[in-house]
Amino acid sequence: MLIHICCSVDNLYFLKKAKEAFAGEKIVGFFYNPNIHPYSEYLLRLEDVKRTCEMLGIELLEGDYELEKFLDKAKGKELLGEKSERCFECFDLRLEASALKAFELGEEKFTTTLLTSPKKDPNQLIAKGQSIAQRHNLEFVVFRNDNFEHFKSELDLNLQALARENELYRQNYCGCQFALKIQKESQNRSPFELYSPLKRQILPASIEERTQVFRTLDMAKKDANKPFLAQKTIATYRLLNGGVWLSKNSNPLNCCILARSKSKAKVRINDLRWVFSQRLSVLVGYSQRDETLFLTLEGLNTLMAKNYDNLKELNLNPLNYEEELSLRALVSGSESINPIIVLEERTEKTLFVEIKSVFQEEKVFYLL
């Protein structure tokens, strides 16, 4: 039997039940989920599914990541919610590919762990799966036999507990970018998962940080003193865009905006003064009318023991996020959110500053 797999949280419990129900029969897992976005999230879920399949001794095959096929299916349905026609089209894409893979492998049966998802309508899935199975002369397995509702009820109680016990990645959205946007909008929150960093950094509460956590956990799983997976809530930050201009219509100057710099409408700073800070032993630019602070690249090099030649080099090989927070703490305090901007060199000219940023609470995984 081939089992289409969507994620580890659904996967572990479902595969255990499948192995019990079909004892002695070979089970093949198939990870085909072109709806998952961004690609880094897809890879994170794939890595975790590999872990659960290894735990159970089940072979796992990976399908192609065909995002364009999903986007074609979702066209015109982007604004629909969960359990809508968009989800039905997504089922069609994934279950059709699963049926074709089962047929290719010579399997007679297939099913999907999506049946256990609390975000999906099992009746929609069953109808679609049976329709596709009939076209390919296959059987779509539902674990019914008058016990599917019991199976689903039991799963709802135990799914998250089993995931926590086995330290699996528990994603906070179904997978597609459209569902994520709708979910975040309903919570009045920004979809951080869809934001790419303006600098080459691994940011708190990012998919890249989650990947690091679970890879570290996986590498240490055989250690006697292995760390424990836990969650916490943090107040984190994203810089969306920003810059410094000599006039409203000029090209932006090379600059580096430090982490936790709050949003600024395009403010005009015409009283910029540079003073030598005895406390910091570097030049600092400030205005009596605005709280934005300026450092020169030379000042950054001094404070952070770096040797950047120019701002292009800094932006290509930036300070990591923690270093930026350390620099902020040195200059204006760890709790500060006033803009701090690094310029190539000191300037006495009038400057226009604009910053768009977001502060938001996020629940993150970490290791104890």
From Swiss-Prot:
Iron-sulfur keyword on record: yes
Enzyme class, first EC level, given as a word: oxidoreductase
EC number per UniProt: 1.17.99.6
Gene Ontology biological process: queuosine biosynthetic process; tRNA modification
Gene: queH
Protein keywords: 4Fe-4S, Disulfide bond, Iron, Iron-sulfur, Metal-binding, Oxidoreductase, Queuosine biosynthesis, Redox-active center, tRNA processing
Protein name per UniProt: Epoxyqueuosine reductase QueH
Function, as annotated: Catalyzes the conversion of epoxyqueuosine (oQ) to queuosine (Q), which is a hypermodified base found in the wobble positions of tRNA(Asp), tRNA(Asn), tRNA(His) and tRNA(Tyr).
Homology family: Belongs to the QueH family.
GO MF term list: 4 iron, 4 sulfur cluster binding; epoxyqueuosine reductase activity; metal ion binding
Domain of life according to the entry: Bacteria
Disulfide bonds: C174-C176
The UniProt record lists the keyword Signal: no
